[in-house]
């Protein structure tokens, strides 16, 4: 017997398809929607439709945007000689909110994760190499071994060489590639793979520092975080 509205149950079911939303939370959301003014509900519905119809990916950096190229890639005020590589568009947003970075970006679309069946060909890794050197061709990618990690978490992947055998300097004018991937095994594997892939090119490959958060206490930090903080220590200004 149906004790509640079929429309409400359908909405609850749709809400449960969202990440981290369980049945109880979905039902609370559905009940909240019932109490919302009609115009607010229509605004949400229109926003959901617009996201699927109007949003696209920048053909240069692959960030989610309303235009192509995106405002960052299309701006002459950004430093195109520096590319910050991130996993997802949300990571780009986080970095932009610091107002400290003036370069451009490259969104990978994830990280290399052999356990999840995600390899380099599933990401926009080779598109990054092409941005640095337009003559780069990914002819050896299929023959390259899949990235793996050793028991201690170190990546032992070997990146496929570029067909041009290396470039004396990046033809696109890129001087530095900053790897802003998460500090975990998958992030380490991805960073290692990219660093090896870009080795033939005359570009500096760096990775964002890892260490203690501002306001954090040493006694609560784990050993790995403390080790990274010590390794990345700098001069006191």
Curated annotation (Swiss-Prot):
ZnF (C4-type) intervals: 58-73
Would the keyword DNA damage turn up in this protein's UniProt record? yes
GO molecular function annotations of the record: DNA binding; zinc ion binding
Region annotated Disordered sits at: 132-171
Which UniProt keywords are present, listed alphabetically? DNA damage, DNA recombination, DNA repair, Metal-binding, Zinc, Zinc-finger
- Provide the GO biological process annotations: DNA recombination; DNA repair
Q: Which CDD domains match?
A: TOPRIM_recR (cd01025)
Which residues are in the Toprim domain? 81-213
| Top-level taxon of the source organism | Bacteria
Q: What is the role of this chain?
A: May play a role in DNA repair. It seems to be involved in an RecBC-independent recombinational process of DNA repair. It may act with RecF and RecO.
Q: Which family does it belong to?
A: Belongs to the RecR family.
Record protein name field: Recombination protein RecR
Organism of provenance: Salinibacter ruber (strain DSM 13855 / M31)
**What is the phylogenetic placement of the source species in the record?**
Bacteria, Pseudomonadati, Rhodothermota, Rhodothermia, Rhodothermales
């Amino acid at each position: 017997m149906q004790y509640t509205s079929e429309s409400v149950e359908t909405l609850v079911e749709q809400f449960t398809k969202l990440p981290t939303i369980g049945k109880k939370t979905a039902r609370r959301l559905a009940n909240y929607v019932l109490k919302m003014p009609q115009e607010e509900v229509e605004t949400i519905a229109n926003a959901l439709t617009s996201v699927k119809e109007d949003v696209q990916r920048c053909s240069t950096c692959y960030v989610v945007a309303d235009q192509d190229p995106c405002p960052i890639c299309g701006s002459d005020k950004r430093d195109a000689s520096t590319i910050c590589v991130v996993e997802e568009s949300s990571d780009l947003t986080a970095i932009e909110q610091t107002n400290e970075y003036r370069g451009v970006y490259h969104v990978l679309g994830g990280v290399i994760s052999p356990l999840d069946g995600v390899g380099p060909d599933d990401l926009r890794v080779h598109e990054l190499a092409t941005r640095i050197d337009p003559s780069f061709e990914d002819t050896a990618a299929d023959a390259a071994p899949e990235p793996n990690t050793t028991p201690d978490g170190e990546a032992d992947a070997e990146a496929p060489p570029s067909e041009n055998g290396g470039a004396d300097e990046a033809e696109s004018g890129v001087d530095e590639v900053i790897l802003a991937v998460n500090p975990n095994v998958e992030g380490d594997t991805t960073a290692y793979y990219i660093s090896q892939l870009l080795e033939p090119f005359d570009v500096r490959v760096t990775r964002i520092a890892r260490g203690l958060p501002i306001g954090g206490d040493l006694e609560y930090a784990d050993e790995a975080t403390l080790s990274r903080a010590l390794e990345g220590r700098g001069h006191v200004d």
